[in-house]
Amino acid sequence: MLSFVDTRTLLLLAVTSCLATCQSLQEATARKGPSGDRGPRGERGPPGPPGRDGDDGIPGPPGPPGPPGPPGLGGNFAAQFDAKGGGPGPMGLMGPRGPPGASGAPGPQGFQGPPGEPGEPGQTGPAGARGPPGPPGKAGEDGHPGKPGRPGERGVVGPQGARGFPGTPGLPGFKGIRGHNGLDGLKGQPGAPGVKGEPGAPGENGTPGQTGARGLPGERGRVGAPGPAGARGSDGSVGPVGPAGPIGSAGPPGFPGAPGPKGELGPVGNPGPAGPAGPRGEVGLPGLSGPVGPPGNPGANGLPGAKGAAGLPGVAGAPGLPGPRGIPGPVGAAGATGARGLVGEPGPAGSKGESGNKGEPGAVGQPGPPGPSGEEGKRGSTGEIGPAGPPGPPGLRGNPGSRGLPGADGRAGVMGPAGSRGATGPAGVRGPNGDSGRPGEPGLMGPRGFPGSPGNIGPAGKEGPVGLPGIDGRPGPIGPAGARGEPGNIGFPGPKGPSGDPGKAGEKGHAGLAGARGAPGPDGNNGAQGPPGLQGVQGGKGEQGPAGPPGFQGLPGPAGTAGEAGKPGERGIPGEFGLPGPAGARGERGPPGESGAAGPTGPIGSRGPSGPPGPDGNKGEPGVVGAPGTAGPSGPSGLPGERGAAGIPGGKGEKGETGLRGDIGSPGRDGARGAPGAIGAPGPAGANGDRGEAGPAGPAGPAGPRGSPGERGEVGPAGPNGFAGPAGAAGQPGAKGERGTKGPKGENGPVGPTGPVGAAGPSGPNGPPGPAGSRGDGGPPGATGFPGAAGRTGPPGPSGISGPPGPPGPAGKEGLRGPRGDQGPVGRSGETGASGPPGFVGEKGPSGEPGTAGPPGTPGPQGLLGAPGFLGLPGSRGERGLPGVAGSVGEPGPLGIAGPPGARGPPGNVGNPGVNGAPGEAGRDGNPGNDGPPGRDGQPGHKGERGYPGNAGPVGAAGAPGPQGPVGPVGKHGNRGEPGPAGAVGPAGAVGPRGPSGPQGIRGDKGEPGDKGPRGLPGLKGHNGLQGLPGLAGHHGDQGAPGAVGPAGPRGPAGPSGPAGKDGRIGQPGAVGPAGIRGSQGSQGPAGPPGPPGPPGPPGPSGGGYEFGFDGDFYRADQPRSPTSLRPKDYEVDATLKSLNNQIETLLTPEGSRKNPARTCRDLRLSHPEWSSGYYWIDPNQGCTMDAIKVYCDFSTGETCIRAQPEDIPVKNWYRNSKAKKHVWVGETINGGTQFEYNVEGVTTKEMATQLAFMRLLANHASQNITYHCKNSIAYMDEETGNLKKAVILQGSNDVELVAEGNSRFTYTVLVDGCSKKTNEWQKTIIEYKTNKPSRLPILDIAPLDIGGADQEIRLNIGPVCFK
């Protein structure tokens, strides 16, 4: 909407142009003048209307460097003109022919006119011949990572890997049923091996077994094919200001920008010496005739004054916009294969694999020798039924059975697995050229081609007829501001201008002495305006008076006729970079450049973080069952170890004949998961054919290119539990590597602080005033002087109102596919952001259903009333959890000390009245209650958030660029995107050093005198002339009449900042702004004091998704938009609120990661009941997450298990003293005085002690076991004496000693007792201690008694301590 000032300016422009037209008509019809001489050759006519866009030309080769451009306008000359100059005015009427005038003397050449506006582009010329390929460009910056390539074909099976390290011993199994006592048998001699039996007939498949427990998490699947492009996401929030990009090549000179806001008034500089005389001003109005002075003598010209001192450096401009993105660099050669990475953390649980084929029955093992007879024991009570034993090893393959009767036709089988992908065939031979097709329909108008290289200058054309004024072209995009030039030296005076009309010669006056500068008198009041006087006789030309003050800027006059083009000036010195111009409109997408030459191979980058897990691959074919191993003794069940490396699949066996139908076997166990097959293209579903026998393996083909990582193979059969070996010694440091190649130039460093402003230089001495020169003829009005240097950058203006969306442009052609860019370097993790402000209090959620009543506990003593907690942030409504199993009743705690009074909290909501309970006495220890019935199944949980990205796989070799695809059809017009929010203002750059002054230009040749032109319209008012010498004091004139009120002047510069005003009253609360950018994870706050339990609420509706409890247009972004209702800040506030809501949800549902740890494994199980057991991060003491610890969470029992460091104390003849038979503490005496430690990598011992203390407070049950490996040493019961005198002693955390017999609270139990007699062989005893006093664990030391002999050795394995 036009403002009042804009409307008034338009009206004045219209009136001025109308007056100018009328004045020219009157002058033309006044009198007929004589015929003039033949006029000079006219300018080239205006360009014709624009032609249709031609087809895209082939990109030409880089042209030769162009000639030096014309000198740019100095300073902010362009700022004095509007961005679009007026077109030529309408052609005037032809006046009557005047009488021939006398030929005037040819005037000297005028100043070079400013360059005219660029005309509309002409029609596109025909496409030039394809030039030779240009030189290879510089290597571009790394492109964005390309899409992952298709997985390679499956490689040849690798060799058998080395045997893995033995796993840690597992937790003890359940105690088996005691068998009946056998009769005492005599020890028989071992029998000879029996003859190998005939293979039995293969049995029929057994009934399917029960569904097995959830398997361990599968390995990360191979990356799936890229999905279809998703819909355009909403505009992201404003990112942080990126680092300044490299300085781009200088863009083409932009159109003159609109005049910027006037800068603030700069400080007054030191006065420089007088410069050379400026151009002559306009002829002033005739002055009053002064008194005739005595004639003076002409003086000689004075010497030019000394050059003024250099001014202070100007303020550096804001950083420029990032340059255009470079063309993609050439594809680098494949880097060397990186070293194998460390084993990653176990991934989340994979889905259960399908059952494998049933293995063949194993052969019957040889009978073992009978064992020694045991003493007859008391018959034990019947134990629980043990778990099914492991299946025996498969038997040898049986002979083929007799051929059965043909069976009935079976149903069609399921579709077989897809075959492996065939090798890519060689490229076919190029076929012969086809016949010419018939001419096609005329295509759509192609986009505008590239501008061709400038042609040779043609001969001057004949003067064409003056064309109609062309339609104003659309304003082009605002180009980037050119670099700011250094002010050049003041050039020589230009050639003399054309002589003006001769004035009457004034009488020569005497030169008066230079008077001192008088003080300015006070301004007189304006008198009333007098009547206009009669026109007086033209007086003699007075001396040039002092230059008047600058007038207001006049309205732009009508455009004059264009002058002849001046000679191109020499190329100026490149100036400093100017302030960045506003961003130009987005240009059309250019065609991709040709690929550059391949760059050198870059150094191998550091291993990036692992990517997100891909989808599961197809199931592979099952491998052949391996040969049976000898059955080892079953070890104790341990914690699940880290997943081992995959075994290689065996070769495929031949297909056997169909056997006789056997009896129904017992339910089989889940088969092993097959190796992943290569992803084949889906074929049509056919009926299953008979399976052919496998042919012999062909010779190994040449190694193919490295494929993408396949799925992880099957887990091989577990080997026997070995003992962990001692840690190897540290290796010698490697030799110093060769010096690497010089790295690429780093990014610009941060801007240093602005240096102090240098002191102003001293003023040069004033030159002696020269004697007055003789009076010259009055010159014509001089051309507009060069504009002054640019003022300092003004404060940024307010944001303009968004313009209406432009019409959609035509769809561009699809560009050629660029080569795949190199993988970008991995960015470093951002630092944790500051904690965000607390969110708004949520509305009260609907009440939940009443829970099932728990068993009544024994009444505890009445505790002291705790301090009221702070009002917490509203939590999101949780889903209904599974009802928990009722826990056993704990012992009553002692009366706690009264805590300090808390700060006064806000008043809470009024609770429902509670039931008055009578204070009961402290009860005795109750027996543990029975387990409650299992709760109903909860509703399925929502899909979890996307996990943290896994470690990045090894860098694959760069794929070859694909062939050029066909040109796609013209796309539909896209919708105009929403305008993005304004970017943040970048930091001010540092003050650059002053560049050297340019060399003085060569004086130009004097031009040919031109014909006298018609009298021009009055020019713009010139700049102030130099201060003249003070004239003789004139007589005081009569007071003039008051003048009419002039028009309002242009807005003055901003005044200096006034003193700060008083604080205003607090305004109304603003509307809620948009959400800001999501902050990083805030640190965990300290736990508040527990509040009193509230009454159960009424039942709520079944849980759906989380609903944010604000109704309607609470966010301003949801309200109907009006031009004044929305500000950029509002979006940030809205985004901040939404981000805070997300963060609160994250706090309420911890993820078990290092950045978002849970407090205990129980919290994780409650938040994610669908998760499986594994290693997770917890932070029992809450607060900062830097001291979070990694533990094993057993979700089946809800236990949190922490491993000892180290877990194994190696084998040794620890102690040599067979005489002193006393308990010797391993950690205190034998092991160098160090107790068992429970540390986690990255956490100090003190921090770990704090975490363990919190774990003990949070738990009400703890357990731990220790395996005592012995050779000729008694650990628990001595079989010879039948007593426990030689049993070991354990030391708990609170210095309590745990013994084999005595008080039941401090006695441990033994699960396996192999160290009960001395057999000169290694045995083991597994000791377990469970307690409902978690402060007693973990175990810190062990003291055996039966050690010290030369043949006695022990080794310890400390199991994890588990809290519940």
Curated annotation (Swiss-Prot):
Ranges for domain Fibrillar collagen NC1 come to 1131-1364
UniProt modified residues of type Pyrrolidone carboxylic acid:
23, 80
Disulfide-bond pairs as recorded: 1161-1193, 1201-1362, 1270-1315
PTM (free text): Prolines at the third position of the tripeptide repeating unit (G-X-Y) are hydroxylated in some or all of the chains.
This chain is glycosylated at 175, 1265
Q: Which residues carry this modification: Allysine?
A: 84
Per its record, how is this protein called by name? Collagen alpha-2(I) chain
Native species of this protein? Bos taurus
